[in-house]
Amino acid sequence: MRAACVAVALALLSACTTVSEPVRPQARALPDTERPVTRPGATPRERIVEIATQEWTRWGGQVVRLGRDDTSCVTYSPVPAPELPAPLPEIPEAQPLSPAVAGVPAAATTDTESKTNGNPPPVASCLSFPDGTGMEATPLGCSLARRYWSIVGEAPGCRQVTQGSWAWSAVFISWVLRKAGLDERQFLTGQSHSMYVVDARDGILPRPAFHIEPVPAMPRPGDIICAGRGRDRYLEDIAEIGFGTTPMHCDIVVGVDPATRVVRAIGGNVQQSVSMEEIELGDSGRLDGITNSHMPWLLVMRNDLQ
Protein backbone atom coordinates (compact mmCIF):
# COMPACT_ATOMS: atom_id res chain seq x y z
CA MET A 1 0.00 0.00 0.00
CA ARG A 2 2.79 2.36 0.95
CA ALA A 3 4.67 1.57 -2.27
CA ALA A 4 1.54 2.31 -4.27
CA CYS A 5 1.14 5.71 -2.55
CA VAL A 6 4.76 6.56 -3.31
CA ALA A 7 4.27 5.63 -6.96
CA VAL A 8 1.17 7.83 -7.21
CA ALA A 9 3.00 10.74 -5.57
CA LEU A 10 5.92 10.43 -7.99
CA ALA A 11 3.54 10.32 -10.94
CA LEU A 12 1.80 13.49 -9.77
CA LEU A 13 5.13 15.24 -9.23
CA SER A 14 6.26 14.24 -12.70
CA ALA A 15 3.06 15.62 -14.22
CA CYS A 16 3.53 18.93 -12.42
CA THR A 17 7.10 19.36 -13.65
CA THR A 18 6.52 18.33 -17.27
CA VAL A 19 7.16 21.23 -19.65
CA SER A 20 4.37 21.43 -22.19
CA GLU A 21 5.31 21.73 -25.84
CA PRO A 22 4.32 24.92 -27.72
CA VAL A 23 1.17 24.72 -29.81
CA ARG A 24 3.21 25.01 -33.02
CA PRO A 25 6.83 24.23 -33.91
CA GLN A 26 9.21 26.90 -32.68
CA ALA A 27 12.98 27.09 -33.17
CA ARG A 28 14.95 26.52 -30.00
CA ALA A 29 16.89 29.59 -28.86
CA LEU A 30 20.66 29.42 -28.44
CA PRO A 31 22.00 29.66 -24.86
CA ASP A 32 21.77 33.28 -23.71
CA THR A 33 22.19 34.96 -20.33
CA GLU A 34 21.45 38.54 -21.38
CA ARG A 35 18.77 40.16 -19.22
CA PRO A 36 17.85 43.74 -20.18
CA VAL A 37 17.24 46.00 -17.18
CA THR A 38 13.92 47.85 -17.03
CA ARG A 39 12.31 50.08 -14.42
CA PRO A 40 11.28 48.30 -11.21
CA GLY A 41 7.57 47.58 -11.33
CA ALA A 42 7.32 48.07 -15.11
CA THR A 43 4.37 46.22 -16.65
CA PRO A 44 4.93 43.76 -19.53
CA ARG A 45 3.71 46.40 -22.00
CA GLU A 46 6.12 48.96 -20.55
CA ARG A 47 9.01 46.48 -20.62
CA ILE A 48 8.42 45.90 -24.34
CA VAL A 49 8.62 49.64 -25.02
CA GLU A 50 11.65 50.13 -22.77
CA ILE A 51 13.67 47.27 -24.25
CA ALA A 52 12.88 48.32 -27.83
CA THR A 53 13.98 51.86 -26.98
CA GLN A 54 17.18 50.61 -25.34
CA GLU A 55 18.05 48.66 -28.47
CA TRP A 56 17.35 51.68 -30.67
CA THR A 57 19.74 53.72 -28.51
CA ARG A 58 22.44 51.04 -28.75
CA TRP A 59 22.22 51.22 -32.53
CA GLY A 60 22.79 54.99 -32.46
CA GLY A 61 19.25 56.36 -32.58
CA GLN A 62 18.56 56.37 -36.33
CA VAL A 63 15.29 58.09 -37.30
CA VAL A 64 13.18 57.54 -40.42
CA ARG A 65 10.32 59.85 -41.38
CA LEU A 66 7.31 58.34 -43.15
CA GLY A 67 5.65 61.51 -44.36
CA ARG A 68 2.17 62.51 -45.36
CA ASP A 69 3.82 63.59 -48.62
CA ASP A 70 4.44 59.89 -49.42
CA THR A 71 8.17 60.03 -48.70
CA SER A 72 10.35 57.74 -46.60
CA CYS A 73 13.62 59.38 -45.59
CA VAL A 74 16.31 58.88 -42.99
CA THR A 75 16.37 62.16 -41.06
CA TYR A 76 19.16 61.17 -38.65
CA SER A 77 21.78 58.44 -38.70
CA PRO A 78 24.94 57.86 -36.66
CA VAL A 79 26.77 56.83 -39.83
CA PRO A 80 27.47 58.96 -42.90
CA ALA A 81 25.53 58.65 -46.11
CA PRO A 82 26.70 55.70 -48.21
CA GLU A 83 29.01 56.37 -51.12
CA LEU A 84 27.02 55.03 -54.03
CA PRO A 85 28.21 54.73 -57.64
CA ALA A 86 27.49 57.82 -59.68
CA PRO A 87 24.55 57.41 -62.07
CA LEU A 88 25.45 56.75 -65.67
CA PRO A 89 25.20 59.80 -67.93
CA GLU A 90 21.98 60.03 -69.86
CA ILE A 91 22.23 59.18 -73.54
CA PRO A 92 20.53 61.81 -75.70
CA GLU A 93 17.28 60.41 -76.92
CA ALA A 94 16.97 60.13 -80.67
CA GLN A 95 14.07 61.93 -82.27
CA PRO A 96 11.47 59.24 -82.95
CA LEU A 97 10.37 58.69 -86.49
CA SER A 98 6.77 59.24 -87.34
CA PRO A 99 4.76 56.03 -87.76
CA ALA A 100 4.49 56.66 -91.46
CA VAL A 101 8.26 57.06 -91.92
CA ALA A 102 9.01 54.07 -89.71
CA GLY A 103 6.66 51.93 -91.74
CA VAL A 104 4.51 51.04 -88.73
CA PRO A 105 0.77 51.62 -88.44
CA ALA A 106 -0.04 54.48 -86.07
CA ALA A 107 -2.19 52.18 -83.92
CA ALA A 108 0.85 50.02 -83.14
CA THR A 109 2.86 52.74 -81.37
CA THR A 110 3.61 52.07 -77.66
CA ASP A 111 3.16 54.58 -74.83
CA THR A 112 6.48 54.55 -72.90
CA GLU A 113 6.11 57.84 -71.03
CA SER A 114 5.76 56.22 -67.57
CA LYS A 115 7.29 53.01 -66.24
CA THR A 116 6.83 53.82 -62.52
CA ASN A 117 3.51 51.99 -62.12
CA GLY A 118 2.06 55.04 -60.42
CA ASN A 119 4.72 55.19 -57.69
CA PRO A 120 6.27 58.59 -56.94
CA PRO A 121 9.81 59.11 -58.25
CA PRO A 122 12.61 58.93 -55.66
CA VAL A 123 13.55 62.20 -53.97
CA ALA A 124 17.18 63.07 -54.69
CA SER A 125 17.75 64.66 -51.27
CA CYS A 126 16.25 61.70 -49.36
CA LEU A 127 18.87 59.75 -47.41
CA SER A 128 18.59 55.96 -47.52
CA PHE A 129 20.85 52.96 -46.95
CA PRO A 130 20.89 50.04 -49.44
CA ASP A 131 21.76 46.49 -48.35
CA GLY A 132 25.38 46.18 -47.29
CA THR A 133 25.61 49.75 -45.95
CA GLY A 134 24.53 51.60 -42.83
CA MET A 135 24.85 50.48 -39.23
CA GLU A 136 24.36 46.76 -39.90
CA ALA A 137 27.57 46.80 -41.96
CA THR A 138 29.61 47.97 -38.95
CA PRO A 139 31.19 45.59 -36.41
CA LEU A 140 28.83 46.93 -33.71
CA GLY A 141 25.76 46.50 -35.90
CA CYS A 142 26.74 42.96 -36.83
CA SER A 143 27.23 41.89 -33.21
CA LEU A 144 23.90 43.42 -32.18
CA ALA A 145 21.94 41.84 -35.05
CA ARG A 146 23.43 38.40 -34.43
CA ARG A 147 21.93 38.47 -30.91
CA TYR A 148 18.46 38.67 -32.39
CA TRP A 149 19.02 35.65 -34.62
CA SER A 150 20.01 33.59 -31.58
CA ILE A 151 16.40 33.71 -30.36
CA VAL A 152 15.49 31.34 -33.22
CA GLY A 153 18.63 29.21 -32.93
CA GLU A 154 20.64 30.81 -35.74
CA ALA A 155 24.16 32.26 -35.69
CA PRO A 156 24.76 34.01 -39.04
CA GLY A 157 28.07 35.62 -39.91
CA CYS A 158 28.49 39.33 -40.50
CA ARG A 159 28.36 38.92 -44.26
CA GLN A 160 25.03 37.12 -44.00
CA VAL A 161 23.56 39.78 -41.71
CA THR A 162 23.93 42.37 -44.48
CA GLN A 163 22.18 40.22 -47.11
CA GLY A 164 18.49 40.49 -47.91
CA SER A 165 18.00 36.74 -47.50
CA TRP A 166 18.85 37.19 -43.81
CA ALA A 167 16.39 40.01 -43.10
CA TRP A 168 16.28 40.32 -39.31
CA SER A 169 13.24 42.50 -38.57
CA ALA A 170 11.10 39.57 -37.36
CA VAL A 171 13.78 38.12 -35.10
CA PHE A 172 14.30 41.60 -33.62
CA ILE A 173 10.68 41.69 -32.48
CA SER A 174 10.86 38.07 -31.32
CA TRP A 175 13.94 38.89 -29.25
CA VAL A 176 12.41 42.01 -27.66
CA LEU A 177 9.20 40.25 -26.66
CA ARG A 178 10.98 37.25 -25.19
CA LYS A 179 13.37 39.51 -23.26
CA ALA A 180 10.36 41.46 -21.98
CA GLY A 181 9.19 38.26 -20.30
CA LEU A 182 6.53 36.91 -22.66
CA ASP A 183 6.48 33.12 -22.44
CA GLU A 184 5.40 30.47 -24.95
CA ARG A 185 1.78 30.63 -23.80
CA GLN A 186 1.68 34.31 -24.79
CA PHE A 187 3.93 34.60 -27.85
CA LEU A 188 5.94 32.26 -30.07
CA THR A 189 9.06 33.47 -31.83
CA GLY A 190 9.51 33.31 -35.59
CA GLN A 191 11.89 34.10 -38.43
CA SER A 192 8.95 35.63 -40.32
CA HIS A 193 6.49 38.28 -39.13
CA SER A 194 3.63 36.32 -40.65
CA MET A 195 4.25 33.48 -38.19
CA TYR A 196 3.24 35.41 -35.10
CA VAL A 197 0.65 37.47 -36.99
CA VAL A 198 -1.16 34.24 -37.92
CA ASP A 199 -0.78 33.01 -34.32
CA ALA A 200 -2.60 36.13 -33.09
CA ARG A 201 -5.17 36.07 -35.89
CA ASP A 202 -6.12 32.45 -35.28
CA GLY A 203 -5.96 32.66 -31.48
CA ILE A 204 -3.94 29.46 -31.09
CA LEU A 205 -2.10 30.33 -27.86
CA PRO A 206 -3.42 29.54 -24.35
CA ARG A 207 -2.83 33.10 -23.09
CA PRO A 208 -2.25 35.24 -26.20
CA ALA A 209 -0.59 38.60 -25.64
CA PHE A 210 -2.00 40.05 -28.87
CA HIS A 211 -5.10 40.07 -31.03
CA ILE A 212 -5.47 41.45 -34.55
CA GLU A 213 -7.27 44.65 -35.51
CA PRO A 214 -7.38 45.82 -39.13
CA VAL A 215 -6.57 49.40 -40.11
CA PRO A 216 -7.63 52.16 -39.96
CA ALA A 217 -6.87 52.14 -36.26
CA MET A 218 -5.03 54.16 -33.64
CA PRO A 219 -2.23 52.10 -32.07
CA ARG A 220 -0.99 52.41 -28.50
CA PRO A 221 2.52 52.02 -27.06
CA GLY A 222 3.32 48.31 -26.84
CA ASP A 223 1.19 47.43 -29.87
CA ILE A 224 2.79 46.04 -33.02
CA ILE A 225 1.92 47.50 -36.43
CA CYS A 226 2.39 45.50 -39.62
CA ALA A 227 2.36 46.01 -43.38
CA GLY A 228 2.59 43.69 -46.37
CA ARG A 229 5.71 43.67 -48.53
CA GLY A 230 6.75 42.61 -51.99
CA ARG A 231 4.06 40.73 -53.86
CA ASP A 232 1.65 41.26 -50.92
CA ARG A 233 2.36 44.97 -50.51
CA TYR A 234 -1.29 45.89 -50.94
CA LEU A 235 -2.87 42.83 -49.35
CA GLU A 236 -6.34 43.81 -48.13
CA ASP A 237 -7.73 40.69 -46.46
CA ILE A 238 -6.01 39.61 -43.24
CA ALA A 239 -7.45 36.13 -43.77
CA GLU A 240 -5.11 35.72 -46.76
CA ILE A 241 -1.94 36.00 -44.66
CA GLY A 242 -0.10 32.68 -44.84
CA PHE A 243 1.93 31.27 -41.97
CA GLY A 244 5.57 31.99 -42.77
CA THR A 245 4.81 32.63 -46.44
CA THR A 246 3.43 36.18 -46.64
CA PRO A 247 6.22 38.81 -46.75
CA MET A 248 5.57 41.45 -44.09
CA HIS A 249 7.23 44.07 -41.91
CA CYS A 250 6.26 44.93 -38.33
CA ASP A 251 7.35 47.57 -35.81
CA ILE A 252 6.81 48.09 -32.07
CA VAL A 253 4.87 51.26 -31.20
CA VAL A 254 6.70 53.29 -28.54
CA GLY A 255 4.83 56.60 -28.65
CA VAL A 256 1.70 58.28 -29.99
CA ASP A 257 1.10 62.04 -30.33
CA PRO A 258 -2.54 62.66 -31.33
CA ALA A 259 -2.01 66.44 -31.39
CA THR A 260 0.59 66.29 -34.16
CA ARG A 261 -0.85 63.06 -35.62
CA VAL A 262 2.44 61.19 -35.34
CA VAL A 263 3.04 57.58 -34.28
CA ARG A 264 6.56 56.58 -33.27
CA ALA A 265 7.54 52.95 -33.76
CA ILE A 266 10.82 51.05 -33.53
CA GLY A 267 11.71 48.27 -35.91
CA GLY A 268 14.68 46.15 -36.86
CA ASN A 269 16.32 46.07 -40.29
CA VAL A 270 14.75 49.44 -41.13
CA GLN A 271 17.25 51.22 -43.37
CA GLN A 272 19.83 48.64 -42.25
CA SER A 273 19.53 49.46 -38.55
CA VAL A 274 17.18 49.48 -35.58
CA SER A 275 15.36 52.68 -36.43
CA MET A 276 12.61 54.80 -34.97
CA GLU A 277 9.96 55.55 -37.58
CA GLU A 278 8.08 58.81 -37.22
CA ILE A 279 4.83 57.92 -38.96
CA GLU A 280 2.76 60.92 -39.98
CA LEU A 281 -0.93 60.01 -39.97
CA GLY A 282 -3.34 61.05 -42.70
CA ASP A 283 -6.52 63.10 -42.55
CA SER A 284 -8.35 60.47 -40.50
CA GLY A 285 -5.83 60.79 -37.69
CA ARG A 286 -5.44 57.00 -37.63
CA LEU A 287 -2.96 54.52 -39.04
CA ASP A 288 -4.04 53.43 -42.52
CA GLY A 289 -2.85 51.70 -45.65
CA ILE A 290 -3.06 54.63 -48.05
CA THR A 291 -1.23 57.65 -46.58
CA ASN A 292 2.27 56.40 -47.41
CA SER A 293 2.91 53.90 -50.19
CA HIS A 294 6.32 52.99 -48.76
CA MET A 295 4.58 51.34 -45.80
CA PRO A 296 0.92 50.52 -46.56
CA TRP A 297 -0.13 49.45 -43.07
CA LEU A 298 -2.42 46.45 -42.89
CA LEU A 299 -3.08 45.67 -39.23
CA VAL A 300 -2.40 46.38 -35.59
CA MET A 301 -1.45 43.58 -33.22
CA ARG A 302 -3.23 44.86 -30.12
CA ASN A 303 -1.31 44.27 -26.92
CA ASP A 304 -3.66 42.71 -24.35
CA LEU A 305 -1.11 42.91 -21.53
CA GLN A 306 -1.08 45.55 -18.82
Where are these regions (language model features)?
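Bacterial signal peptide processing site
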Residues: 17-19
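Low-complexity, Gly/Ser/Thr/Pro-rich intrinsically disordered linker/tail segments
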Residues: 269-306
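C-terminal motif of bacterial Sec signal peptides marking the signal peptidase cleavage site
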Residues: 13-15
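Bacterial N-terminal signal peptides that target proteins for export
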Residues: 1-6
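N-terminal capping segments
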Residues: 24-185
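...with weaker cross-activation on analogous glycine-rich loops/strands in unrelated enzymes
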Residues: 188-271
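Short, solvent-exposed loop/turn and secondary-structure capping segments
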Residues: 64-65, 187-189, 237-238, 276-278
